[in-house]
Amino acid sequence: MTPYEKGRSFEYTTIRALKAKGFTCMRSYASRTPADIWAVRDGRAYFIQAKLHGAISAKEWDTFLEYCHEAGAEPIISKRPDGKTRGVEFYRILNRRGTGKRPWELLTLTDFGLI
C-alpha cells in the first residue's frame, strides 16, 4: 500500500467509528481543505484531521485550528493507538503549537459524545 492509500484507509476507519456512534460524516477528497473529515451529531460540528501515526507539523496544526475556529467546529485529530494495528484515538486540539501549554487532550468516548 502506498502512503496515500494507508492514509485514505485510516480516514475511512475513522469515519466508520464515528458513524457507528451516530455521527453524520463527510470526507474531504484529495485534502482540499485543512479537515479530512467533517462530522456532525446533535447539532455540533467536528472537523477531524486523520493522522495514522499522529504526526502533524506546527504549521498544519495551527492552520487546522484556525480553520475550525472560523467555522465554529471542534478541532479533532484522530490517530491509531500507539503500538496497535487497529482502532482510533481522538484528540481535541486546545491551543496553537508553541504556546507553552499542552496543545491537545486525549478524549474519552464520553468526552467526544461517543456513548
What is the role of each PLM region?
Residues 1-28:
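Acidic-basic catalytic patches of nuclease active cores, encompassing PD-(D/E)XK
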Residues 5, 72-115:
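Domain-level recognition of nuclease-like catalytic cores that cleave nucleotide substrates
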Residues 17, 66-67:
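Alpha-helical scaffold elements within enzyme catalytic domains, especially in hydrolases
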Residues 18, 37-54:
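Conserved catalytic cores of phosphodiester-cleaving nucleases, focusing on short active-site segments
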Residues 36-37, 77:
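Short beta-strand scaffold segments in enzyme catalytic cores
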